[in-house]
Amino acid sequence: TEVERIKRLMSEAGLRISAQGVNQFTKNHAANRKVFDLAKRLGNRNISADPSEDSFDSLEKLVAEYNVRIAIHNHGPGARYDKIADVLKAIKGRDPRIGACADLGHYIRSAEDPVKAIRLFGDRLYGVHLKDFAEPKKDAKGVILGRGQLDVIAVYKALKQVNFPADGALSLEYEENEKNPIADVKACVAVALDAAAKA
C-alpha cells in the first residue's frame, strides 16, 4: 500500500513522521476517524488541527481510542485560533491529548508573545513551528530565524521548562525566497541548533 511504501522510505532515510496536518475537523465522526486511522498507520502521535467547535466530542473519543494527540494550530490574525486565549479556551476541560501546536510566527503576526504561548500551553504543547517575522503585524515579512521578533534561545529555554515531549513535533518553517530557499533554510537551521545548544 501507499502507507507501507511511505513508512519504508522514511525508515530507510532514518526519519519518522512527527505530525500531519493542518487538518480540518467537524462533527463528522467517520471523516475524523479516517485522519486518526492514517496517523496510527504511519506511527504518528500528533495531528495538527483547526477543529470546528462542534468537533470536540468526536475528537475526545478518537484521541482516547487511538492514543494520538490533537494539536490546535493558530493561523494568525483573524483566524479561529489566532490568540493564545482561543486555544486555551478550546482545550480547557478536554482530554489532555487535545492540546496546542504553536506556530510562533503566526503568534508574532497576531501580536502575541510566542514564548508566553509555550509557557501557558505547558504540558499541552505537542507541536511547535519555528518561524520568524520582521514585525508584529498581519502582513509582516518572514525572515531568517532569529533576525526578526523571535527570541530563539528563549523559545528553547521555554520548551525545556515545559518538558516538551520527545515525540512532539518541532518543525522549522520558512516560506520566503521560494525560487532558491536552500541557503536561507541552512541559516535558519544553524540558528536553531545554536539556540538549542545555548538554552
Predicted regions mapped to residue ranges:
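Glycine-rich, flexible loop segments associated with nucleotide phosphate handling
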Residues: T1-R5, A169
